[in-house]
Amino acid sequence: MSKKIKVLVVDDSPVFRALLSEIINSDPQLEVIGAAEDPYQAREMIKALKPDVLTLDIEMPKMNGVQFLKNLMRLHPLPVVMISTLTQHGADATLMALELGAVDYFPKPSVANTADMLGYRSLVNEKIRMAAQAQVGANQSMSPAVASSSAVSTSQYQLIAIGASTGGTEAVKHLLSALPASMPPIVITQHISAMFSGPFASRLDASCALSVSELTQGEVALKTNHAYVAPGDKHLMVFRRGGQLYAHLDDSPAVNRHKPSVDVMFGSVAESLKGKAIGVILTGMGKDGAQGMLQMKQQGAITVAQDEQSCVVYGMPRAAVECGAAMHIKPLNKLPQFLCDLLS
């Protein structure tokens, strides 16, 4: 029998510590080896128990989870999954935690997300199992140099489509912040909660030369020098009307358990742009995006996957490589210049 993944739960609520411990212990691959009520207790337990994964509440007395994470990543980096409230403040704190090196997050249980308690259990345990295999700090060490580009307006490529999941909030930020302002329209599907997609787009906008916004209305004409982020609860699809490209939001069911789905976006890009697009698949667990990227390649588009070494989780890019969808494989820090060279 393979060794169980050792988990340390850090949360100030005794009720939630008990609930989360029970959920984690119900998975045969996982084992809760301890539960701490605050970061100070957690620090001692990490030294003594050597957990494989930490679940960390954001809101705690004495020291909040984000501050503790900052210290932890400096002194004793290990895979951390944040536990967040689905609020504006929770979104900002969670995105900051992901920036500092947390692998992933899941929401605190609420009436809304625990109506399907089995689904909630499997989400929590899947994220913890995946975190145990993550390359902590992969994003941090891969900051790309700012790319330069010329003649983007005359490029044959009229759109760039980017798909990402776990580890993607930072990978997308690293990629976009290294791109020049003169780019064709960029559409982004990042697996993220609906409450978080707006703040995610705002953070990107603040760190990029491009103008970045969340797509909020049904239909938008796509503009050069702009990037558009799918909201966390709708598919982003691209279509052409006359000579103009548009994005629209689609409320059909989840695909590959995801909404927004990268496959849906890539599939629509393949159909509407044929060979005049570039598809990029970044870090993330699962296989979403691989089949859509294959459609793009078959239609003549250029396709590129992030390499294993620079991924936090080499799941989606691996699936794209294995099914033959990815024409190029690049480390994150080489992607911005690679895209600019294609456009030039």
From Swiss-Prot:
Subcellular localization(s) per the UniProt record: Cytoplasm
Post-translational modification comment from the UniProt entry: Phosphorylated by CheA. Phosphorylation of the N-terminal regulatory domain activates the methylesterase activity.
Residue span(s) of domain CheB-type methylesterase: 153-344
The reaction(s) this protein catalyses: [protein]-L-glutamate 5-O-methyl ester + H2O = L-glutamyl-[protein] + methanol + H(+); L-glutaminyl-[protein] + H2O = L-glutamyl-[protein] + NH4(+)
EC identifiers of the protein: 3.1.1.61, 3.5.1.44
Gene Ontology cellular-component terms listed: cytoplasm
Catalytic residues in the record: 165, 191, 288
One GO MF term attached to the UniProt entry: phosphorelay response regulator activity
Predominant place of localization: cytoplasm
Entry-linked PROSITE patterns: CHEB (PS50122), RESPONSE_REGULATORY (PS50110)
Keywords: Chemotaxis, Cytoplasm, Hydrolase, Phosphoprotein
Chain positions with 4-aspartylphosphate modification: 57
Domain Response regulatory: 6-123
Any single GO BP term: chemotaxis
Pfam families membership: CheB_methylest, Response_reg
Domain of life, per lineage: Bacteria
Family: Belongs to the CheB family.
UniProt free text on domains: Contains a C-terminal catalytic domain, and an N-terminal region which modulates catalytic activity.
Protein function: Involved in chemotaxis. Part of a chemotaxis signal transduction system that modulates chemotaxis in response to various stimuli. Catalyzes the demethylation of specific methylglutamate residues introduced into the chemoreceptors (methyl-accepting chemotaxis proteins or MCP) by CheR. Also mediates the irreversible deamidation of specific glutamine residues to glutamic acid.
Protein name, as recorded: Protein-glutamate methylesterase/protein-glutamine glutaminase 2
